[in-house]
Amino acid sequence: MLSARSFLSSARTIARSSLMSARSLSDKPKGHVIGIDLGTTNSCVSIMEGKTPKVIENAEGVRTTPSTVAFTADGERLVGAPAKRQAVTNSANTLFATKRLIGRRYEDPEVQKDLKVVPYKIVKASNGDAWVEAQGKVYSPSQVGAFVLMKMKETAESYLGTTVNNAVVTVPAYFNDSQRQATKDAGQISGLNVLRVINEPTAAALAYGLDKDAGDKIIAVYDLGGGTFDVSILEIQKGVFEVKSTNGDTFLGGEDFDHALVHHLVGEFKKEQGVDLTKDPQAMQRLREAAEKAKCELSSTTQTDINLPYITMDQSGPKHLNLKLTRAKFEQIVGDLIKRTIEPCRKALHDAEVKSSQIADVLLVGGMSRMPKVQATVQEIFGKVPSKAVNPDEAVAMGAAIQGAVLAGDVTDVLLLDVTPLSLGIETLGGIMTKLITRNTTIPTKKSQVFSTAADGQTQVQIKVFQGEREMATSNKLLGQFSLVGIPPAPRGVPQVEVTFDIDANGIVNVSARDRGTGKEQQIVIQSSGGLSKDQIENMIKEAEKNAAEDAKRKELVEVINQAEGIIHDTEAKMTEFADQLPKDECEALRTKIADTKKILDNKDNETPEAIKEACNTLQQQSLKLFEAAYKNMAAKNSGGDAQEAKTAEEPKKEQN
C-alpha cells in the first residue's frame, strides 16, 4: 500500500500547447480519413469533400445504418437494415444496442438490468466481461461493433471507389478508459486504423462551428442518443474548440425509452387480455418495434395508434393488440428518464464555471433530442430555445470527418482541445482514492506525484488505478493494477515512489511508477482485468478476414444465381415471343438446357459459382445462336417483302410512261 502523507510533491502538469503541431508531416495518414459515429441504435459515416463534410448513403440509400447484427441458421451474417428486418423471426440471434455492453463487466448493475430486457443472451466471458451469444457462438461487444464498422467502411469504399484504412471514431463523452479502449479494439478488428477516438458532443460542436464567423462563443451540446447521454460545455474562439466540462450517463438513451414503453404496453395488454406477452419472444420483438415506431411518431404528432394483430394466441383463440397512445401519456411514462438528464447539465455548468445566461447556443444531438418534452426540458435548464443548426443524426459523424481532415493536414485552422470526463487516481493508505488528474482536465496531459511506503521494510508496492469521483477507491471503477518490486527495505515514509499518469488525445491512460532511489520503473498501458488481449484481438481480426472472404464468396454466388435466373427468364420469354420463327428441334434442345440449368440452381448450396457461371454461359451461347438464326430469317423475309413492294410500285410508273 502507498501512503500519500509523506513526500507529497507539488503537482506537475505537462501542458501540450498544440495538438496540431504534435503530428509531424511524416505521421500524417495517407489516403482518405473517414469519420464514423458508432452509435447504439444507428451508425453514420462521413467524408470531407474539400472543406465540407458529406454524409455517405449506404447500399440501401439511407444516410444512417442500424447498429444491428444478426446471424442466420445457415451461418450468414447480416448487418444494418437486413438484420433489423428479420429480427421478429430471429430475435434470439439478432444483436442490437451492444454498445451499452462495451467495456463492461458481466456483474455491472447496468448489464444485469439489460439481461432482463434483451431477447439475446448476455454471457460472462472468461475474463469476466459481458459478451453476447448468437447461434451458439459468443462474441465480444467489440466484435459486434467491428461488424458495424466494417459496414461503414464498405459504405465509404463504395462511394469513394477506393480502399479506406483510416478513421476517426466517436464515443460518448462519459465513456471510461475501458470503454474507449474497447472501441479502439473494435476499429482494429474491423481492419481500420483508428487515428483518434473523439467525444460525440465535441464532434457535433465541430460540425456546428466549422463555418461559423470567428468570435468568442460558449455553447452547450445536449446529446441524448440511443443508449447514452452526454452534455458538454465548449468555448469556440477563432477555430479553437475548447471543452470546458463534460458530464453524462452511459446508460441512458432511446433504448431506455423503448423499454419503458414496452413495459407499459405489456401491462396494458395483460390487464385487458389476461396474457403475459413477456413469455412470447416473437410477440416481444414485435412490441419493441411498435414501441420504437410510436416513440418516433409522437415527436411530430400528439397521438398514435399501436395495432398488432395476432400478437399472440391462447386457448380462446388469437389475440390482437390495439390501443391509442397520446404524447402526454408517453411523456408521463418516460418522465423520470428525461429528469435524469437535468443533474448532469447542472454539474457541467458548475464544473465549467459558466452560468446558463452565458451560453450562446444549445445544440441538440441524438435521435431522442427530437422529442418535444426533451426540448422543453433543455429550454428550462439553459433558459433559451435550443438550436437546430445541426442534424441530430448526422452531426457527430460530420464532426469526426472534420477531425480526420485536421489529422490529415487538409484542415489547418481548427484546433480541438478535449477533456478527460472522469478523475484518475490510485488507492492509498486506508483505501482512499488519491486523484492525480481531476475530471475535465484538458487532454493530452501528464501528471506526476510522489508517494511513499505505508509500512516498515516494505520492498514492493502495488499500484491500483481507479477512475471516478468517489472518495473511497473501491467505490470507483478499477482500471488496472501492477506492482513495483525491488524497493530497498527502509522505514515507512522513506522510499520515494513517483507515480506518473499520461492521458493521450484518445483519452487512453498510461501509468508508470519509478523508485527514485534505485531508478527501477514499471509502466503499463491501462488494460483492466477485463478487456481483450492482443491474442484475442489478432484472432478476431483473422476471423473477420475469413468472414469477409466468405461473405465475398456468398455475394458472388448470389450475383451469379441472379444472373442465371435472369438469363433463363429472358430466354423463355423470347422463345414464347418468337415461337413460330424457331426450329422445333433446336427449341427442344434449348428447353433441355434450361431444365439442366434449373437443376443446378436448385442444388445451388452444393454448387460453386464457377459451375453455375459455366452453365449460364453455355445456355446463353446456345440461346444467342438460336435467336440470331431466327433474326436472320426474319430479316430475310422482311427484305424479300420490301423488294416485292418496290417491284409492285414500279409497274404503274412503267404503264404511265
Curated annotation (Swiss-Prot):
Where is it chiefly localized? mitochondrion
Name the PROSITE patterns for this protein: HSP70_1, HSP70_2, HSP70_3
User: Matching InterPro entries, A to Z?
Assistant: ATPase_NBD (IPR043129), Chaperone_DnaK (IPR012725), Heat_shock_70_CS (IPR018181), HSP70_C_sf (IPR029048), HSP70_peptide-bd_sf (IPR029047), Hsp_70_fam (IPR013126)
* One GO BP annotation of this record: iron-sulfur cluster assembly
Question: Which locations, inside or outside the cell, does it occupy?
Answer: Mitochondrion
Keyword ATP-binding in the entry? The reply is yes
Q: Which GO terms describe its cellular component?
A: cytoplasm; mitochondrion
Basic and acidic residues bias: start-end ranges: 644-657
Similarity remark: Belongs to the heat shock protein 70 family.
Tell me which HAMAP family the record gives.
DnaK (MF_00332)
NCBIfam families hit by this protein = PRK00290.1, prok_dnaK
Q: What is this protein called?
A: Heat shock protein hsp-6
